[in-house]
Regions:
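Non-transmembrane, membrane-proximal soluble domains of secreted or membrane proteins
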Residues: 1-225
């Protein structure tokens, strides 16, 4: 961060969702609707808000010219705020040992003008690849020195499924499991006519549990008004 150039409080930070994989980095841009592997970019002087998680092994996200190191961990989200004040191409890496492909787990960060960033986004949108749950499950398989890859669109809610470890069909998300516990666990499930754990192990029953929890939450919100 520049010592002489204060941040403009009226500028909306650029959100970048970061997923550490074996052994590559996935970057998702919810505002722009794109995603990239082993490459990301941001406009100069625009604050960046990183949200980070991991798929299996803890890693450490580090761009020495941008900001300090921060860990990315499975089932958890960490956050980092940063800004780049000078155009250029910078090296990013995993600074925490994470297995066989650790040494090649690097990426490029491009600090661009506003026009250059818009052009970079448009280039990604022309790649024609779609990042949905199926293509994500292929991407997440371990690979070393993965080439830069760009996705023109991203399935809604994908990052939240990654964070809650439920990208696979039929797998209940962590936040739904926690909601069940908060509602009373097995006693609550029996009250609404479901038995744990067997009834939650199918796609249909998992969806039913979530629907019941959503209904309970909406009723509670109405009661509080």
């Amino acid at each position: 961060i520049s010592q002489t150039k204060p941040l403009d409080p009226n500028v909306q930070p650029l959100e970048v969702q970061v997923v550490s994989m074996d052994w590559k980095w996935l970057f998702l841009y919810p505002e722009q609707g794109i995603a990239t592997v082993n490459e990301f970019a941001a406009p100069v002087d625009r604050p960046i808000r990183f949200k980070l998680t991991a798929t299996s092994t803890m890693a450490a996200f580090y761009v020495p010219d941008l900001a300090g190191m921060i860990y990315a961990m499975p089932g958890m989200e960490t956050q980092l705020n940063a800004v780049i004040n000078k155009e250029g191409t910078y090296k990013g890496l995993n600074s925490h040992y994470s297995g066989a492909g650790f040494s090649g787990m690097t990426f490029k960060f491009h600090g661009l003008s506003n026009e250059g960033f818009d052009a970079w986004v448009q280039q990604a949108k022309t790649e024609g690849k779609v990042l949905d749950r199926a293509s994500y499950l292929e991407l997440v398989k371990p690979s070393e020195r993965h080439p830069v890859t760009r996705f023109s669109s991203v399935q809604d809610g994908l990052y939240n499924r990654v964070l809650n470890m439920c990208v696979e069909e039929g797998k209940m998300c962590m936040h739904h499991m926690m909601a069940i516990d908060a509602a009373g666990g097995a006693a609550y499930m029996k009250k609404v006519g479901l038995n744990l754990p067997d009834d939650v192990c199918s796609v249909e029953n998992a969806d039913r549990v979530v629907a019941l929890l959503d209904q309970r939450d909406s009723q509670g919100a109405v009661a509080q008004q």
